[in-house]
Design a protein with these regions (language model features):
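P-loop NTPase motor core
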Residues: 91-167
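Conserved P-loop
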Residues: 2-6, 10-94, 98-103
Length: 167
């Protein structure tokens, strides 16, 4: 049996930062809800807008600073988080994190590019390159000194069904 020297220490209460995800379909109020909650938690609010300037419609209702992102490479989200930290914001809203997955230079597009570069149809090899990038972005969110709220879009599923009268 191996001797494990992993000492436990007494737990000490410390200030923890909010990590919240608000998930819903387009138009469900994710941006408004995140701004409303952020206003109660912090005085200086930063918002990363990856939804084509959609947060601007709330500029008259809430006080916040915005950064428009058009390239959703994980490193751009990391850079934006660090910028918000350096500018001493209290809270950061990432509206939305979805393009980091399925947007321009998001994870899915990066996998396609890596697979093409590697000349393979085996996406596992491509994911080997992309997963560490994505994990670094998630780690930046989790380790930040800011309260962070992220919004994410759910897919809307449409179903066509026939009624009793055949319509």
């Amino acid at each position: 049996m191996q001797d494990h020297n992993l000492p436990f220490t007494k737990a000490i209460r410390s200030q923890i930062k909010l990590r919240l995800a608000i998930i819903g379909p387009s138009g469900s109020g994710k941006t408004y809800s995140s701004l409303l909650l952020a206003s109660a938690l912090g005085k200086k609010i930063a918002l990363i807008d990856s939804e084509r300037n959609s947060a601007s419609k709330y500029a008259d209702l809430f006080k916040f600073s915005v950064l428009e992102l058009e390239d959703f490479h994980p490193d751009n989200f990391i850079e934006a988080i660090r910028s918000a930290e350096e500018q001493k914001f209290d809270l950061l809203i990432i509206d939305s994190l979805s393009p980091a997955w399925n947007g321009h230079n998001g994870a899915l597009e990066l996998v396609d590019k890596a697979a093409a570069r590697l000349k393979t149809t085996n996406s596992f090899a491509a994911w080997r390159e992309v997963t560490p990038l994505h994990n670094r972005m998630i780690d930046a969110i989790l380790r930040s000194d800011l309260h962070i709220i992220v919004t994410m879009r759910t897919k809307t599923e449409y179903s066509l069904e026939k009624t009793d009268n055949g319509k």
